[in-house]
Structure formats: C-alpha cells, structure tokens
C-alpha cells in the first residue's frame, strides 16, 4: 500500500492528522517543490518527494488536505498528476479545500461530491465550477475512486480513507475507530 499526502503552503494539517497516524507506515509526503512547506497551523513540513518524482502507477491513495488552496488552482503539474491518477482508477481523497482543488480542476464533474468548510455552495462567482458537480449534502462522499469531505468531518474522512486502504477487519472496527477519534465511550 502506498499512500501519498500532498503538502502545499497553507494546507490544514489537522484535517489529515488521523490519516497520517493510521497509515504512517505506508505514507509519503509529496509537494510541487522540494522546500519547507508551512501549514495554516504555522508548522513546518519537509516533503519526502516532489510530484515530478512520483510515478502514478506507484500510488494507491492520494490525499489532498484543505486549508488555503488558492495558489494551487494554477498548478498545472498537480492537475495533470491528478488526472493521470484518476485515469488509472487510483483513490483521490480531498477534504475541504482539497475537494475544492478537485472541483476547480474539473475532476468532480458529473460526480457526487461535497467539500469546503461547510459544503460546496454555488454562487454566481463559482457556478462555472460547481454546476457540473452533483453536490450531496453529506459530510463525506465517495463516488467510485473519489472521496470528498467537508472540513469538520476530518474524523469521518480519515475513516473513509482507511476503508479505501483496507485497514479495517470489518465495519465494527471502523465504527470503533471513529468512536475513539471522537472520544465517544
């Protein structure tokens, strides 16, 4: 199992913390450039590799955290990479702004999805992006190989990504893990 998380300046580390902890032994951090990345929490991260060094055939799951993704909208390298992954049926998981990146690139066109902080909201300024998506009022949505989630559902998002990775022995294992994440006794 090879799981990649994508780092970009302004990403929200908390949205992927459970994924990184649970899948750490399978995890590689990738970024557009080999440089220190600063999260919205002002933590510094050094990626393991760059996108240009990653072979899409070697990726099982690619996770895009939210945060402040506006600088990624023009990242043609990321867009091309995601479309290669999608063509190969690889799992692409985006939460909050990560799902927004997927939507902006057109990756979610014709798909069931949700994202941003409180769910995708169509406005006159963004309808050219979101009108092609079947926006679902759910915290986490899986449509084929694509997983999207709203920010506050980072625990549920982590569970869905772990399900895609096949780490749970059964559904009760997933439920118990979610209860542990949320401190539900």
What do the PLM-derived regions correspond to, one by one?
Residues 2-6, 10-11, 17, 21-35, ...:
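Active-site-adjacent pocket-lining segments in enzyme domains
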Residues 40-42:
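N-terminal strand-loop element at the rim of the active site
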């Amino acid at each position: 199992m090879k799981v990649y998380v994508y780092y970009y300046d302004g990403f929200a580390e908390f949205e992927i913390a459970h994924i990184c902890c649970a899948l750490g032994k399978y995890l590689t951090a990738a970024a557009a450039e080999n440089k220190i990345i600063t999260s919205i929490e002002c933590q510094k991260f050094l990626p393991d590799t760059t996108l240009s060094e990653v072979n899409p055939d070697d990726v099982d799951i690619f996770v895009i955290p939210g945060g402040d993704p506006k600088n990624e909208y023009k990242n043609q390298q990321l867009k091309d990479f995601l479309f290669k992954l999608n063509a190969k049926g690889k799992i692409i998981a985006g939460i909050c702004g990560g799902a927004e990146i997927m939507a902006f690139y057109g990756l979610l066109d014709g798909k069931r999805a949700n994202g941003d902080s409180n769910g995708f909201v169509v406005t006159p300024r963004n309808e050219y992006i979101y009108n092609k998506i079947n926006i679902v009022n759910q915290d986490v949505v899986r449509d084929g190989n694509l997983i999207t989630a709203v920010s506050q559902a980072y625990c549920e998002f982590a569970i869905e990504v772990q399900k895609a990775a096949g780490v749970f022995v059964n559904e009760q294992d997933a439920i118990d893990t979610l209860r542990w994440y949320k401190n539900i006794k």
